[in-house]
């Protein structure tokens, strides 16, 4: 799916060229059975999203992993637009790190895109021996041809934000990207911008803290992250630590797609803020809060105040719109970021959540809403959970949404999700004036899977997307 040229590698030459790419016809997403009561392996689902297809909105293939309780989570590619100039590279393998087992699965999606098959399994012992890292999260492909995967911890479940390097051809474990002893205290997501010789990583919590659920006392004890780590891209070492004001649990991080840009955004889940990070004239980096989702005072919930819980953010490929999900409040938002210092709300849509009418939670005080939103029913299915992982079409006109965050937190905050399974929804985007509208004809119900209700997570398109590809 590369731009047509005589001697191109994978992906597209620029983010704006990517916007001209073909419409998505299938998507890949991991489905999780850990913590659901179903003793079955996680699997990679292939879903038909072509409205002209007779199999539209159907799971057309399932690839089960050979082990139980891996907790598949995010995925990345063997190569992407960072290797566009290398015609020897081809985007044919999807790399799936396991959040809990620390196993890495490499899946062949090139031979038969509609029927992926397992290519290689990298066992935890190989990663432990060469890297002393575990609990793996984000996978990004590098221009060097390597694959880089972030970690949350060490083998014992203590916090350790390091990076596993894989050979992009053989998928052998090469070691760590960071220098020996140079890991961050905690880890989660990362994004790099080579033209500014920088990578920035985020942090969730130590695996031992989050593995079995959320305990508010752990927040009081300072066990959850509130920093960004600025790395020298060439020297592979931390050069600055940014402390976030109102920035508890910084998760997904996105630089602007323009490789010349020296700024981006991070979503801070528990504080429910969007923070803008940027490079100063002297070469150091700073951060400022640009969006705050106010908490709601509630009755009948875990705490007296409910945060929005921003769990995923995306930037459109033209760097015009920012999207994020409030998993607990239940709304999906669109902001115009033409002026990155002053994002402007242009679209908001409620897709379930914890404050719907008729539910166990009563909202006592709300700075934003006059009444609690209606429950979401799509094609006769009442949707459990709230909007979580989001993926945008290349042209920016369609958003796909799944409702599961992480099995242990799903079980705690949305027990209905465990019983009924997650769903995949699609939202139409107005890219002229701004605005979001649910497609009432689109529903993939993972509650009806053959082995029982499953928890579907992050989406990927075969040709890359706005959270998998980095331009250099």
From Swiss-Prot:
It comes from the Eukaryota. It is a peripheral membrane protein. Its main location: nucleus. Pathway: Organosulfur degradation. One of its GO terms (cellular component) is membrane. InterPro entries: Se-bd. Interacts with USP33. Catalyzes the oxidation of methanethiol, an organosulfur compound known to be produced in substantial amounts by gut bacteria. Selenium-binding protein which may be involved in the sensing of reactive xenobiotics in the cytoplasm. May be involved in intra-Golgi protein transport. This is Methanethiol oxidase. The gene is SELENBP1.
């Amino acid at each position: 799916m590369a731009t047509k040229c005589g001697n191109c590698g994978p992906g597209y030459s620029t983010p704006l060229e990517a916007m001209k790419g073909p419409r998505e016809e299938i998507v890949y997403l991991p489905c999780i059975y850990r913590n659901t009561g179903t003793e079955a392996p996680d699997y990679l689902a292939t879903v038909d999203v072509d409205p002209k297809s007779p199999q539209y909105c159907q799971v057309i293939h399932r690839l089960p992993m050979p082990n139980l309780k891996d907790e598949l989570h995010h995925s990345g590619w063997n190569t992407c637009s960072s290797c566009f100039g290398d015609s020897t590279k081809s985007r044919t393998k999807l790399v799936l790190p396991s959040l809990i087992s620390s196993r890495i699965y490499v899946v062949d999606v090139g031979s038969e895109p509609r029927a992926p098959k397992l290519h290689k399994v990298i066992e935890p012992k190989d990663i432990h021996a060469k890297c002393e890292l575990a609990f793996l999260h984000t996978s990004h492909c590098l221009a060097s041809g390597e694959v880089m995967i972030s970690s949350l911890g060490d083998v014992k479940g203590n916090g350790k934000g390091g990076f596993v390097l894989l050979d992009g051809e053989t998928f052998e474990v090469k070691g760590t990207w960071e220098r020996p002893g140079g890991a961050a205290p905690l880890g989660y997501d990362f994004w790099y911008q080579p033209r500014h010789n920088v990578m920035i990583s985020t942090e969730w919590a130590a695996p031992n803290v989050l593995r079995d659920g959320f305990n508010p006392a752990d927040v009081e004890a300072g066990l959850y992250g509130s920093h960004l780590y600025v790395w020298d891209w060439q020297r592979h070492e931390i050069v600055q630590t940014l402390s976030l004001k109102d920035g508890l649990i910084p998760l997904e991080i996105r630089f602007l797609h323009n490789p010349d840009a020296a700024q981006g955004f991070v979503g801070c889940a528990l504080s429910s803020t969007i923070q803008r990070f940027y490079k100063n004239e002297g070469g150091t980096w700073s951060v400022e809060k640009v969006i705050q989702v106010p908490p709601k005072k509630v009755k009948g919930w875990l705490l007296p105040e409910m945060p929005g819980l921003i769990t995923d953010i995306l930037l459109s490929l033209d760097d015009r719109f920012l999207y994020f999900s409030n998993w607990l409040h239940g709304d999906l938002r669109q902001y115009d970021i033409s002026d990155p210092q002053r994002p402007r709300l242009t679209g908001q849509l409620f897709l379930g959540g914890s404050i719907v009418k008729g539910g166990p939670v009563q909202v006592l005080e709300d700075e934003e809403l006059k009444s609690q939103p209606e429950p979401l029913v799509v094609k006769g299915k009442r949707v459990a959970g709230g909007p979580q992982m989001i993926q945008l079409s290349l042209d920016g006109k369609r958003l796909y949404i799944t409702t599961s965050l992480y099995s242990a937190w799903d079980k705690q905050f949305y027990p209905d999700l465990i019983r009924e399974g997650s769903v995949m929804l699609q939202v139409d985007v107005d890219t002229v004036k701004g605005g979001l509208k649910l497609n009432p004809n689109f529903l993939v119900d993972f509650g009806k899977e053959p082995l029982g209700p499953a928890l579907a997570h992050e989406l990927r398109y075969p040709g890359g997307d706005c959270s998998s590809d980095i331009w250099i």
